[in-house]
Curated annotation (Swiss-Prot):
One GO BP annotation of this record: DNA recombination
Family stated for the protein in its record: Belongs to the RuvC family.
Function of the protein: The RuvA-RuvB-RuvC complex processes Holliday junction (HJ) DNA during genetic recombination and DNA repair. Endonuclease that resolves HJ intermediates. Cleaves cruciform DNA by making single-stranded nicks across the HJ at symmetrical positions within the homologous arms, yielding a 5'-phosphate and a 3'-hydroxyl group; requires a central core of homology in the junction. The consensus cleavage sequence is 5'-(A/T)TT(C/G)-3'. Cleavage occurs on the 3'-side of the TT dinucleotide at the point of strand exchange.
Main location: cytoplasm
Binding site for Mg(2+) 2: 67
Protein's name according to its UniProt entry: Crossover junction endodeoxyribonuclease RuvC
Organism per entry: Photobacterium profundum (strain SS9)
Record's keyword terms, sorted: Cytoplasm, DNA damage, DNA recombination, DNA repair, DNA-binding, Endonuclease, Hydrolase, Magnesium, Metal-binding, Nuclease
């Protein structure tokens, strides 16, 4: 049994999703959003760190998975996203959790079957895979998708290599 915490980072809203993996079965444990109220970036980062730390304390995950930064047209937004990721990662590392990172396209591929899926498709498949009665908030659904991707990808890596290792896993430890 493995409890996986997935994070969809954002400087204003950071989604989190927690699932339990038992063999091939995935079970929903919880999800939500950490909403920052601070106007300055340092204040937001502090709130993200505190929020992720609280989720870790509440759910006691075994592993932590987070979406990588996507570089769009706005470099400033990408930098803020990177800072939010860093804040969440530090919370995980301080709790001695192994950290895994996944590109957005890989997450969509693992959950929906295509790397070009839109948010509605991701939400639908997250509900289907985890047998949720209703749609979670968009950022929480994305975080659950990160956790599902980790469950599927990590399982495949173990099967292929015969051990729990990955080029990116645990590089922050």
């Amino acid at each position: 049994m493995t409890i996986i915490l997935g994070i969809d980072p954002g400087s204003r809203i950071t989604g989190y999703g927690v699932i339990r993996q038992v063999g091939r079965n995935l079970e929903y444990l919880g999800s939500g959003c950490i909403r920052t109220s601070a106007e300055d970036i340092p204040g937001r980062l502090k709130q993200i760190y505190a929020g992720v730390s609280e989720v870790i304390t509440q759910f006691q995950p075994d592993t932590f998975a987070i979406e990588e930064v996507f570089m769009g047209k706005n470099a400033s937004s990408a930098l803020k996203l990177g800072q939010a990721r860093g804040s969440a990662i530090v919370a995980a590392v301080n709790a001695d959790l192994p950290v895994s990172e996944y590109a957005a396209r890989l997450i969509k591929q693992a959950v929906v079957g295509t790397g070009a899926a839109d948010k509605a498709q991701v939400q639908h498949m997250v509900c289907s895979v985890l047998k949720l009665p209703g749609k979670p908030q968009a950022d929480a659904a994305d975080a659950l998708a990160v956790a599902i991707c980790h469950a599927h990808t990590h399982k495949t890596l173990i099967a292929m290599s015969g051990k729990a290792s990955s080029a990116r896993r645990g590089r922050y430890r």
